Every structure is written in structure tokens, then in C-alpha cells.
């Protein structure tokens, strides 16, 4: 993927707060299931904004930085998802989302970002991303010095 969409820490918080507004009233939720690792930061923000204390994880390995590979469930939360929000950072081709949907059919499944190929697996999201665009998450980046374009 040659196109990149960079999400800063500030943007991640802003986008996830927008998602939290869509999940009101908060008292309808028993808890949050974060899809590890991409859903961990959004889950923490949702937990704060919706005052939810019960946070669990489902751990699925499907990426090596920017290359998708075979999915493997490493850990899962109990139940069918009833009364729970399942959160991930994004839905891309829908492979992980399809598995999550099968595991937690009664959950409200949301992501911060969504690409066209996977949108139909989730219930809500905030940011539309083109299918050919790689998303750079803030936890995958560091601030570093860059030389000026023109040195005098």
C-alpha cells in the first residue's frame, strides 16, 4: 500500500471520543472487549468516556506491521458479547472482523477507522479510509528530529 493515513495521539483520542458519543447511554453496556493490540488504546479511552470498569480482551494475531497473515486466536473473552462493546482500531479486509463477529454475535462491534471491504462486519465507526491506504497508528511511531529541507 503506497498511500498512508497517519493518526496522531490527539486524533486517536478525538476520534474515539466521537465513537463514545455514538454509544450513549453508557449504562446499557456491561463492559468492553478490546481486540488486542489495536483495540487496546481505543478501549481505554472508551472505558474512561463511558465510565465502564469491566474491560476484557480478545487476542488475535493477524498482522506483522504492514503485512496480513493467518489469524490465530491467542485468548478470548467469555460469552457471546451480549451487553458488550467490542472495539478495534480498524476494519480492513474484514478477516479479523468476520472472526470477531462469529465469536461475539450479540456484541456491538465498533472500530475507529473502516475501509470499504470490511465495513459490513461492524456496527459503527468514525473515520472512512480508502482500501488502498495503510493506517499508521500513534503507537507505531515516534517523534524524531528531521533535518531542514534547506540547510544554510
Swiss-Prot record:
Coiled coil: none annotated. This is Xanthine-guanine phosphoribosyltransferase. Guanine binds at residues 92, 135. Belongs to the purine/pyrimidine phosphoribosyltransferase family. XGPT subfamily. Mg(2+) binds at residue 89. Homotetramer. It is found in: Cell inner membrane. It comes from Photobacterium profundum (strain SS9). It is an enzyme of class 2 (transferase).
Amino acid at each position: 500500500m503506497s498511500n498512508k493515513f497517519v493518526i496522531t495521539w490527539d486524533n486517536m483520542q478525538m476520534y474515539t471520543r466521537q465513537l463514545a458519543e455514538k454509544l450513549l447511554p453508557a449504562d446499557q453496556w456491561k463492559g468492553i472487549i478490546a481486540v488486542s493490540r489495536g483495540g487496546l488504546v481505543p478501549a481505554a479511552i472508551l472505558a474512561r468516556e463511558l465510565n465502564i470498569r469491566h474491560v476484557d480482551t480478545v487476542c488475535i494475531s493477524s498482522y506483522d506491521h504492514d503485512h496480513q497473515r493467518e489469524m490465530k486466536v491467542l485468548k478470548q473473552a467469555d460469552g457471546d458479547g451480549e451487553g458488550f462493546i467490542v472495539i478495534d482500531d480498524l476494519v480492513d479486509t474484514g478477516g479479523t472482523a468476520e472472526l470477531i463477529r462469529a465469536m461475539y454475535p450479540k456484541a456491538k462491534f465498533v472500530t475507529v477507522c473502516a475501509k470499504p471491504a470490511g465495513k459490513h462486519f461492524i456496527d459503527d465507526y468514525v473515520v472512512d479510509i480508502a482500501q488502498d491506504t495503510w493506517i499508521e497508528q500513534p503507537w507505531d511511531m515516534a517523534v524524531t528530529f528531521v533535518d531542514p529541507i534547506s540547510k544554510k
